[in-house]
Amino acid sequence: MTQLTHINTAGEAHMVDVSAKNETAREARAEAFVDMQAATLAMIIDGSHHKGDVFATARIAGIQAAKKTWELIPLCHPLLLTKVEVKLEAQPEHNRVRIETCCRLTGKTGVEMEALTAASVAALTIYDMCKAVQKDMIIGPVRLLTKSGGKSGDFKVDI
C-alpha cells in the first residue's frame, strides 16, 4: 500500500518537499453534479434567474477557486497554473448540472486538488445562486476523472 505523503515519520502533518522533483507537464480533470428540480434548471437554462447568469458566475468562481486552492487546503503548494477550464452542462434529462474542470501546469506537483476545488466551488456557487428558489438541491458526486504527469503516473476513472 502507498504511504501517505503528508504525514511524517512522527505522524505529524507536513507539506511535502518537492524541491528535488523534476518539472513535468501535468493535467487533472474533475467533475461535480448539482441535482435540482426541473423548474430550477429551466430557470438557469432560460437565463431568467434574478441574480443573473448562473453558469457565467459559477465558471468564474471555479476558476478563482483553482487559483486559490493552496489557501483553502492546508498542505497544498501554491502553483503557477497555466490553464483552468470550467465547463457547465445542463442535463435536463437528469434534472442536473454537470461541471467538468481541467487544470494544467508544468511543475513539480500535481493539479488534482485544483481541479477538484474548481468543480466543488462551481457547484457551491450554483447552489448559492439558486437557494432562494430551491434549498434541497444535492451536490455530488465530486470526483477526479483523470490525472497525467508526475512520478505516480497517469490515472483515469473507470466509468
Swiss-Prot record:
The GO biological-process annotations, alphabetized, read as:
Mo-molybdopterin cofactor biosynthetic process
Top-level EC class = lyase
**SUPFAM superfamilies from the xrefs?**
Molybdenum cofactor biosynthesis protein C, MoaC
InterPro entries, A to Z? MoaC (IPR023045), MoaC_bact/euk (IPR047594), MoaC_sf (IPR036522), MoCo_biosynth_MoaA/MoaC (IPR050105), Mopterin_CF_biosynth-C_dom (IPR002820)
* Taxonomic superkingdom: Bacteria
Task: List the catalytic activities from the record.
Answer: (8S)-3',8-cyclo-7,8-dihydroguanosine 5'-triphosphate = cyclic pyranopterin phosphate + diphosphate
Annotated GO MF terms: cyclic pyranopterin monophosphate synthase activity
Record carries keyword Electron transport? no
Q: In which pathway does it act?
A: Cofactor biosynthesis; molybdopterin biosynthesis
Q: Which Pfam families match?
A: MoaC (PF01967)
Listed EC numbers: 4.6.1.17
Which residues are annotated as active site? Answer: 128
Q: Which family does it belong to?
A: Belongs to the MoaC family.
Q: What does this protein do?
A: Catalyzes the conversion of (8S)-3',8-cyclo-7,8-dihydroguanosine 5'-triphosphate to cyclic pyranopterin monophosphate (cPMP).
Summarize subunit and interaction data from the UniProt record for this chain.
Answer: Homohexamer; trimer of dimers.
UniProt protein name: Cyclic pyranopterin monophosphate synthase
